[in-house]
Each structure stands twice: as C-alpha cells, then as structure tokens.
A protein has these predicted regions:
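Cytosolic, membrane-interface loops and tails of multi-pass inner-membrane proteins
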Residues: 25-47
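N-terminal signal-anchor transmembrane alpha helix
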Residues: 2-26
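Seven-transmembrane alpha-helical bundle of G-protein-coupled receptors
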Residues: 12, 58-61, 84-91
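Juxtamembrane boundary at the C-terminal end of a transmembrane helix
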Residues: 128-133
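Hydrophobic cores of alpha-helical transmembrane segments in multi-pass inner/ER membrane proteins
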Residues: 123-127
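Transmembrane helix-loop-helix
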Residues: 67-122
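Interfacial helix-start motif at the membrane-water boundary
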Residues: 42-61
Length: 133
C-alpha cells in the first residue's frame, strides 16, 4: 500500500476520532451540541444516549485503519491492506448514508449535515482510490 493511501487512511481515522471526542467527551458543551450538531440544550437529555453510542461506533471504526496500518508495518502487510480497505469502505458507505439522511432532512434542515457526510466519506474514498495504485 502506497504512502498516499496510508496517509489518507490515517486522516479518515482521525476524522472518526474527532467525531468520538465531540460525541462522547465534549457533547455536553453548548459549542458542541448546539454549534456542531445543532441540538438545543433543552434536548440534550434526549440525545445523550445517541451521541454516546454513535461516538463509540466512530471510535471503533477509527480503530480499523489504525490497526491495519500497524499490521502493514509489523510484518502482516496483506492483513493490514485488507483491514484498511474494509474500514475505509465502511467509512465511505457510512458517509453516503449520512449524506442521504441529510438530503431527506431526517433531523435537521436539508444541507446542514453535508459537511459531516463529506468529512466522513471523502478521506476514505481518497484512501481507497490511492490504494488501487
């Protein structure tokens, strides 16, 4: 796996680690739940279960490319490549699903979730494309 693909996979993992931090560690801060997620403070108790679980989902998802890169550099290149590809593919599909939920305006005004969907999908797609060469 070339260096560009590895760097892009690491970026994809970092995006998901950032999401974990926002959703689990910092979610109760108004700048996060109101500023990033557009959730009013009054709705915080109703959304805390969601943010906690989705945050850990993102943490576990970030572990895929990280573990894949570790395997790649510790004598298990084939397993590492496949784990990076699978994890990035999963992230790409999750980003597409997030984009669809934005188009359908499932929880916020249409278009307000576009940035999150792109942040989730683009680095993983770029890593997959780079890994093909």
């Amino acid at each position: 796996m070339n260096v560009v693909a590895q760097v892009l996979a690491a970026v994809a993992a970092l995006v998901h680690l950032l999401a974990f931090t926002w959703e689990v560690v910092l979610f109760e801060r108004p700048g996060v739940h109101e500023g990033i997620f557009k959730i009013p403070t009054a709705n915080l108790p109703a959304t805390r279960l969601w943010s906690f679980n989705v945050g850990f989902y993102n943490l576990f998802l970030a572990a895929g490319p990280v573990l894949g890169l570790v395997l790649l550099h510790t004598g298990h290149p084939e397993a590492g490549r496949w784990l990076v590809r699978y994890s990035c593919g999963f992230m790409l599909l999750a980003g597409i699903a997030l984009g669809v939920s934005d188009v359908l305006a499932l929880s916020r005004p249409r278009g307000s979730g576009r940035g999150g969907a792109l942040a989730q999908a683009v680095p993983s797609l770029a890593a997959l494309v780079a890994a093909a060469f």
